[in-house]
């Protein structure tokens, strides 16, 4: 009998990085479809523009580093970075903002650290935060859902506005965003926060047309439920683990419930927190980034809970309406510390 001796590892996982990235990309399709339904073709244009910009930026740096283009570009990480940034940008934001944010995410936040596997911060969230801080007005100007908007721009109109600032008929972005009386150009989270700071009671704010009698704002609850469906698909396939999404959502739900029970006139309800903004996109597609999140099971629970707490604090007391991007980046800083204190004990070690 012949015994063959091979080097470790003795168990192999056949899943390649490119396949995992593609599965995550496919899981975003339900959310993207719902965003298109409520917010129009501009969302699709921004996503496509961000993906092309991400791939071009990645190819440029790979060429400059004299690395094999096919293997590095074929891991689909740049595609996913562009997609996640594209879905986060308002549908009619200028094209150059998308290109700038995506290039910063890929070149500075990813490749400057050495490429995939070496970046300490989530590249898509770095690009988003850079745009949000640099261009706060453009980054918080969302179209009202098409169902209550006076004019719903078609595909050609969306292209004209994104690349030229006006539609073919001469309508500007401001005119398209006007919608109907009482409809602002902000998201439900932004509308609520701004109204509270102005002294309006919560009940009066939630009666505005942008909420449309929905649990978390017209359109936004369905967007979040669609991303939840995509996230459950990833969990069922074993592409991501449950620890981070569950701890994030549970912590956010607990904190928001306590705040709402104590002062419902000042704090959003837990359903509003869970089904508005980037909650479900963050829970299943952003926080679960294997490079920038914790690597131990206990650490993943701590990481998710920390992000959930930070999101609630930023939404409730901070200057920005959502807070998912800032919370993720702040938690990324703590990952080495979390992993250090939650690493499994070595067998036979005291």
UniProtKB/Swiss-Prot annotation:
Cofactors (names): FMN
GO annotation terms (biological process): electron transport chain; transmembrane transport
GO cellular component: plasma membrane
EC assignment: 7.-.-.-
InterPro entries (alphabetical): NqrB/RnfD (IPR004338), RnfD_bac (IPR011303)
Membrane-spanning residues: 20-39, 89-109, 123-143, 215-235, 244-264, 267-287, 301-321, 322-342
Disulfide bonds: none
Main location: membrane
Entry similarity comment: Belongs to the NqrB/RnfD family.
Quaternary structure annotation from Swiss-Prot or TrEMBL: The complex is composed of six subunits: RnfA, RnfB, RnfC, RnfD, RnfE and RnfG.
NCBIfam families reported in the protein's UniProt record: PRK00816.1, rnfD
Protein name, entry field: Ion-translocating oxidoreductase complex subunit D
Native source species: Cronobacter sakazakii (strain ATCC BAA-894) (Enterobacter sakazakii)
């Amino acid at each position: 009998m012949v015994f063959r001796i091979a080097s470790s590892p003795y168990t192999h996982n056949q899943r390649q990085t490119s396949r995992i990235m593609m599965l995550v990309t496919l899981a975003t399709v339900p959310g993207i479809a719902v965003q298109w339904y409520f917010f129009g073709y501009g969302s699709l244009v921004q996503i496509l523009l961000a993906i092309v910009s991400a791939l071009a930026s990645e190819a440029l740096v790979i060429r400059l580093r004299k690395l094999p283009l096919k293997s590095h570009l074929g891991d689909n990480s740049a595609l996913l970075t562009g997609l996640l940034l594209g879905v986060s940008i308002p549908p009619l934001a200028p094209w150059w903002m998308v290109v700038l944010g995506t290039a910063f995410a890929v070149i500075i936040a990813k490749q400057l650290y050495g490429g995939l596997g070496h970046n300490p911060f989530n590249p898509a969230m770095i690009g988003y935060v850079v745009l949000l801080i640099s261009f706060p007005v453009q980054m918080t100007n969302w179209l009202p859902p098409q169902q209550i908007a006076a004019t719903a721009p078609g595909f050609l109109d969306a292209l004209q506005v994104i690349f030229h600032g006006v539609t073919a008929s001469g309508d500007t972005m401001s005119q398209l965003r006007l919608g109907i009386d009482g409809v602002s150009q902000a998201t439900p989270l932004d509308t609520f926060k701004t109204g509270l700071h102005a002294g309006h009671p919560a009940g009066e704010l939630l009666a505005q047309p942008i909420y449309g009698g929905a649990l978390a704002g017209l359109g936004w609850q369905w967007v979040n439920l669609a991303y939840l469906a995509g996230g459950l698909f990833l969990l069922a396939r074993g592409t991501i683990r449950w620890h981070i999404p569950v701890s994030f959502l549970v912590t956010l739900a607990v904190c928001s419930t306590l705040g709402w029970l104590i002062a419902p006139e000042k704090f959003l309800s837990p359903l509003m927190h869970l089904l508005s903004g980037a909650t479900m996109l963050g829970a299943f597609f952003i926080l679960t980034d294997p490079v920038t999140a914790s690597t131990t099971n206990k650490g993943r629970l701590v990481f998710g809970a920390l992000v959930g707490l930070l999101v609630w604090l930023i939404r409730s007391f901070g200057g920005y309406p959502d807070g998912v991007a800032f919370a993720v980046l702040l938690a990324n800083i703590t990952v080495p510390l979390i992993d250090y204190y939650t690493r499994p004990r070595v067998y036979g070690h005291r």
